Structures are given as structure tokens and as C-alpha cells.
Amino acid sequence: MARYTGPKAKLSRREGTDLFLKSSRRSLADKCKLDSKPGQHGRTSGARTSDYGNQLREKQKVKRIYGVLERQFRRYFAEADRRKGNTGENLLQLLESRLDNVVYRMGFGSTRAEARQLVSHKAILVNGQTLNVPSAQIKSGDVITIREQSKKQVRIAEALSLAEQSGFPTWVAVDAKKFEGTFKQVPDRADISGDINESLIVELYSR
């Protein structure tokens, strides 16, 4: 299955919420009606969505937020289910601990897609070593740094400036002047932003 490359706003409108697929310079809600489905006048349906439909829709939404394809998402769920604790919370913590997501949370990329590109292009160091695997799991205490040659990229400076204005998550510590951040800890469920109902995903895979 190929990664979606079409209009990002269409995906957010389909889910009825901002998936944060575009730069945060301007709220997506200011650009388009998120409560209107894609299409010339917004698609409508008289039928009520089934429980299965709601569960499937929630899974698709989370996959799109984190830029994960189906096979990989299933692996994340299997690992989350294997671990002790709440499966849904475990799933979100695994997704939040991905290298590309951590780079995004630290403000080095304005979107997860941009952060993923920085990782793939070897612009990111983890504990002083180049790591170009977006799905790599980051652990507490790991230090993320922008490669020296990449610090001159305007897009990184702009993304960092925006992140400083909006504030960083509590589970990362960022030194913008050094282009460096520390992954302090895996976030608790209450610390993970986003309109996500992970219990629907657990119900879907438990069918």
C-alpha cells in the first residue's frame, strides 16, 4: 500500500478533525470546514455509521496522524497488546516514541511528514550517531540533535520558532540554540494531545 500524497486538508475533513498534517502557521479550521466532508458540497449520508464503521474510521484517523501504513500499524497493535497495562495507551505510547514523531514534537519539523523526511535524509543524530529510520523507537534519556550540516536549513529554524511560540510537550526538553532535544520520558496518556479514542481501535482488533 502506497503512502497517500494527495491534499492533506481532504484527509482532515474526512475525519472531521485537524490531523496536524500541515504546518501549524495557521489553524486548519480557519482554512476549511472540518465538519464538511470532502466533495463539492460535502458528502452526506442518511444512514447512521455502524459501530464497526466508527472503529475503522478511528483506526484510519490514527494511522494518518502518525503516517503509519496498515501492516506496520498491526505490528504496533500486536506489541501494545503483548505489553502489560492498557493496550490502547500502550499503542499511543509506541507511536509517540517513533523517531519521526519525537523530531516533530521537538519542533525540528513543522509536520510529521517533514520530520520523517529529515530523518530519512540523515539530518538527525540520536546520541551522537546518525539514525535514518523514522520508525526507530526512542528511549528515555535519548538525545536528538540536528546534524551540523543541516542546521542551516531555513525550514528547521522556522519550525523551531513556531514550536517555541506554541510550547513543547512536557516529556521533551529542547535547547533551540543548540538544535538539540532530550526525550525525557514516554508520555502518559493524559499528556498525548489529539482527539483520539483508542478504545475503538482496541475493540476493532478484538473482533
Swiss-Prot record:
It comes from the Bacteria. The keyword Metal-binding does not apply. InterPro entries: Ribosomal_uS4 (IPR022801), Ribosomal_uS4_bac-type (IPR005709), Ribosomal_uS4_CS (IPR018079), Ribosomal_uS4_N (IPR001912), S4_RNA-bd (IPR002942), S4_RNA-bd_sf (IPR036986). The keyword Ribosomal protein applies. GO terms for biological process: ribosomal small subunit biogenesis; translation. Keywords: Ribonucleoprotein, Ribosomal protein, RNA-binding, rRNA-binding. Residues 42-53 have a biased composition (Polar residues). Gene3D superfamilies: Ribosomal Protein S4 Delta 41, Chain A, domain 1, RNA-binding S4 domain. Residues 97-160 form the S4 RNA-binding domain. Residues 30-54 are annotated as: Disordered. GO terms for molecular function: rRNA binding; structural constituent of ribosome. One of its GO terms (cellular component) is small ribosomal subunit. One of the primary rRNA binding proteins, it binds directly to 16S rRNA where it nucleates assembly of the body of the 30S subunit. With S5 and S12 plays an important role in translational accuracy. HAMAP family: Ribosomal_uS4_B (MF_01306_B). NCBIfam families: PRK05327.1, rpsD_bact. Belongs to the universal ribosomal protein uS4 family. Part of the 30S ribosomal subunit. Contacts protein S5. The interaction surface between S4 and S5 is involved in control of translational fidelity. This is Small ribosomal subunit protein uS4. It comes from Cupriavidus taiwanensis (strain DSM 17343 / BCRC 17206 / CCUG 44338 / CIP 107171 / LMG 19424 / R1). The lineage of its organism: Bacteria, Pseudomonadati, Pseudomonadota, Betaproteobacteria, Burkholderiales. The gene is rpsD.
